[in-house]
C-alpha cells in the first residue's frame, strides 16, 4: 500500500512537471501573439514583410530570446523593436521564440 502510493506520487509529480514544461514553451500561444504584434514586419511564417526587417524563421530559440530581451532592456536598440519588446513578458518571449524557431526553412544556393 505504502509502495503503491509512493509510486502514485512519483507519477503525479512527473505529470505535473511535464505540464509545467508545456506551459513554459507554448508555440501556439506564440503564434497567436505573432499575429497580433509581429506579422506586419516579420510575417506569421517568419519571412520578413518589409525590407528592413530580418527573417526570423528557423532562427534558434536561444538567439531569438536573447535578442528580444536585449531590445527590452535597452542593450540593443532599434526604433521599432525597442517599442515592441517593452510590451513582452518573459513567458511571451519564450513562446514567440518557440514559434519562430519551430518553422522549418530550406536554403537554395546558386552554383
Ligand atoms: C514595425 C515593424 C516590426 C514589428 C511589428 C516587429 N519587429 Fe522585430 N524587427 C524589426 C526590425 C526593423 C528589426 C531589425 C532591427 C535592427 O536593425 O537592429 C527587427 C528585429 C527583430 C529581431 C532580431 C533579429 C536578428 O536577426 O537579430 C527579433 C528577434 C525580432 N525582431 C522579433 C520580433 C517579434 C517577436 C515581434 C513581435 C512581438 C517583432 N519583432 C515585431 C521590425 C519589427
Q: At which residue positions do the language-model features occur?
A:
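C-terminal capping alpha-helices of c-type cytochrome domains
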Residues: 67, 86-111
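Sequence/structural segment immediately N-terminal to covalent heme-attachment motifs in c-type
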Residues: 24-44, 57-59, 109-111
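Bacterial N-terminal signal peptides
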Residues: 8-18
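Detector for the c-type heme attachment site
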Residues: 41-47, 101-105
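Positively charged n-region of N-terminal signal peptides that target proteins for export
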Residues: 1-5
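Gly/Gly-Pro-rich "capping" loops immediately C-terminal to redox-active cysteine motifs
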Residues: 31, 43-73, 82-87
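Conserved hydrophobic/aromatic "anchor" residues
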Residues: 34, 71, 99-100
Amino acid at each position: 500500500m505504502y509502495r503503491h502510493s509512493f509510486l502514485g506520487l512519483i507519477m503525479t509529480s512527473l505529470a505535473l512537471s511535464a505540464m509545467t514544461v508545456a506551459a513554459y514553451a507554448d508555440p501556439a500561444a506564440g503564434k497567436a501573439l505573432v499575429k497580433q504584434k509581429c506579422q506586419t514586419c516579420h510575417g506569421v511564417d517568419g519571412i520578413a514583410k518589409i525590407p528592413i526587417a530580418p527573417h526570423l524563421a528557423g532562427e534558434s530559440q536561444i538567439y531569438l530570446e536573447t535578442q528580444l530581451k536585449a531590445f527590452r532592456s535597452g542593450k540593443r536598440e532599434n526604433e521599432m523593436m525597442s517599442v515592441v519588446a517593452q510590451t513582452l513578458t518573459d513567458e511571451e518571449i519564450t513562446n514567440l521564440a518557440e514559434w519562430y524557431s519551430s518553422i522549418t526553412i530550406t536554403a537554395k544556393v546558386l552554383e
